[in-house]
Amino acid sequence: ESLVHGDFRLGNIIVNADGLQSIIDWELAHIGNPLQDLGWVCGNSWRFGQNDKVVGGFGELEDLLEGYNSISKLKVNKEMVKCWQVFGTFRWGVICLIQAYAHLNGTINSIEKAAIGRRVSETEIDIVDLLFLGGE
């Protein structure tokens, strides 16, 4: 187990010409399996149309695995990341449902929450693709 960010994706990474500057939004951090962050950043929801770039819409899975394996004692392969990608996609779907429910029951009056709630169907398709159609 290790420290897991919990929402590791491009929107929470600050870079400039000098490279990585910061990783922000640690409110979902917890102790857990570090592969959760790898699966999360590979989720289709964070690719924003760049579906050929499995890692956050900007990188190749092979490069991520090579880099990770070069510095980690834990050796990771595609199948391990895919398991956590399925978990992360399911988790995002549940988060979408919670956001929609908060809007619908009046807890949070927010068009943003309602719009996020509509993304549940995307996670359903992504899980079917990952489990049955050979998706990455």
Sequence positions of predicted segments:
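Active-site acidic catalytic loop and adjacent metal/ATP-binding pocket
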Residues: E1-Q36, C42
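Short amphipathic alpha-helical segments and their helix-coil junctions
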Residues: I23, G59-N77, E122-T123, I127, ...
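Residue-level recognition of hydrophobic positions within alpha-helical transmembrane segments
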Residues: I23, N33, F87, V120-E122
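Short, conserved loop/turn and helix-capping segments at secondary-structure boundaries
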Residues: A29-G32, F58, S110, A114-G117
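Active-site activation/catalytic loop segments of kinase-like enzymes and analogous catalytic loops
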Residues: L35-K73, F87-N105
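Short, surface-exposed loop/turn segments at secondary-structure junctions
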Residues: N51-D52, K78-M80, G106-E112
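All-alpha amphipathic helical-bundle segments outside canonical DNA-binding/catalytic cores
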Residues: K75-F87
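Regulatory N- and C-terminal appendages and interdomain linkers associated
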Residues: N105, S110-E136
